[in-house]
Amino acid sequence: MLSVWNLPVEQQPQQQQQQQQNIINSSNNINSINSALDNILNTTSKGIQLPRFNLLNTSSSGFLTNSNDTLFLENNNNNNNNINQQLNKSVLNSSNKQLDIIKTINEISNEHKSFQPFEITPIKPQSTSTNTYNTEFGVINQNTFVLDSNKIEELRVDTSVLDPLLSLPYNIINNTTNNNNNNNNNNNNNNNNNNSNNNNSNNNNINNNNNKSNTPMKKESTIRNSNSTFEKFESPTLSTTFGLNKEELNTFTTTDMNNYVKQANMVKELSQVEKKELKRQKRLIKNRESAHLSRQRKRERLTDLEHRVEELSSNSIDINKTLSSLENENLILKAEVGQLFEVINDSPVLSALFYKIASLSQQPQKDTIGAY
């Protein structure tokens, strides 16, 4: 809080008196100083008085014939006169300034302006909110805003949470609005009839008016009750006759949809718009099922191909292993055969037996060739 105070008018004369007293004291001090200086000049030595006598009783030539001391003292006297003149000028200037100050103070006192103290308080913002937190002036209450990850995931999964009317078809909304308008019109007509009955009954006696005034109230209550029961009866049929929600479209099958249509036909004769809507929903369900089946077949085919590739890759690995082992065995056998040929060539007996065996083995081959 900042407070500003101005002096009232009653205290101003006291200040003026104090200032005038200060001015008088300063002027008295200046006069005492001047008188002291004059006394000092009058009570000087003989050497100081001689030049005055010479100045008054002698000529200029006699004055010049005096000693140097007298000339020096004359110069001191002139200097003192200059000092006195400067002091008088300063006193006059200070007195003039003090008179100007006194004039301004008198002018202010003549205006008679009384100033009262006032307070400077900060302006608080007017808020109609029911916030219990104490907010300071010029400070913004910044509440931390945190997003809920669970709610974001729910919105990503089900967009129908945003607005339930968006999940319903366009025809359902129009039909519901039309039904509500019709019900409101019927209620207005009933109220108008009741008002006309009341106006007619006012022309009769007071007792008759009291008796008749109770009957339309009963009629209105019965009409309202009947309307409420009718709405309660129609509320479950709206979802059964006008179509399915988005969740139901994602969960229903063709058999469920056929049963749903049968129940709707049993409850109410469907209009052309409703039939088109149900056909559209059937087509959507069939497309969803066919797409699901095609995806399932593709998935099964892909899984079969993956298993087949795995089997073939394992078989190829086994075959490569057997080939490598057979190649090694073939190399070993070739080495053994080469060693046997060397042994046979080294021994003549073995070479003779080898040639006989070879000749005997070639004769039956020739016989078979001749028979063919």
Swiss-Prot record:
Residues 223-234 have a biased composition (Polar residues). Keywords: DNA-binding, Nucleus, Transcription, Transcription regulation. Residues 305-340 are annotated as: Leucine-zipper. The keyword Transcription regulation applies. It comes from the Eukaryota. Residues 1-20, 176-234 are annotated as: Disordered. It is found in: Nucleus. SUPFAM superfamilies: Leucine zipper domain. This is Probable basic-leucine zipper transcription factor G.
